[in-house]
Amino acid sequence: MPYSNPQALVSTTWVADHMSAPDVRLVDCTYFLPNDGRTGPEEYKKQHLPGAVFFDIDDVKNADDPLPHMIPSAEVFSSKVRKLGLGDGNRIICYDHNGGGSAAARVWWMFRLFGHDDVAVMDGGLPKWLAEGRPVTDDIPTPQERHFTARENHMMVRSIEQILSNIDSKREDVIDVRAAGRFAGTAPEPRAGMRSGHMPGAFNLPYGDLMDPEKNFVMRSAEEIKALADKAGIDMKRPLVTSCGSGVTACYAALAFYLIGKEDVAIYDGSWSEWGGRQDTPIVT
């Protein structure tokens, strides 16, 4: 069974064949958790795809919000991406060093959030690219600024107030994509000061399950994604909101669902960094 929206995911071969096309822009979106010991900017400077610019989710954010990498205003997003040479008419290809593409999926979602649908994730990311012996560089490009028209689609994002209200209304199903131990409250959170557990009524589908570890962590097939959703008790006919630790890996699940035709998935941007960091939110363990 093919993907319903295959244009959202491109292969390393496709990128190798099209990376020199005048409308294609490669975007390195690498991000690591605070306790990883590495940073995206450092890894980008070491090696990246030829011509790729670096999109830092800790820079393209709402600087006034204490929560990690919350979405910026449309004006800030437009200002940041135009300086990266990303604009109207570009076919934007996102990838990361992480394997799987969760950080790339966050940037994919952000571009769609701000009205740019011609965007895709390179399946398998840099690890797959390197495993195939494809070229990388440490040269930093100097992009020419382009115009980017940003129009935010507010239906694609949820606030904590909306999630709190939803606990009673149950209008939407919340899919928590953190690892099972974190969901159950038996494993610690990577950020200090977070309570453990999950939101009442949330479903758990760990985002890592959506990747194939034996194939450089490429996205699983449409059949496999549907089977995983069914196993988790997720009803694809219901309105869905994905949540994670800080709004990054939630976007990988949104990408997976988008690929199989579920296009209206929203992201709880604050995710567990917000929910687990407060004392007035209900938690189940």
What are the functions of these language-model segments?
Residues 1-285:
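Cytosolic catalytic domains that perform sulfur/thiol-centered chemistry
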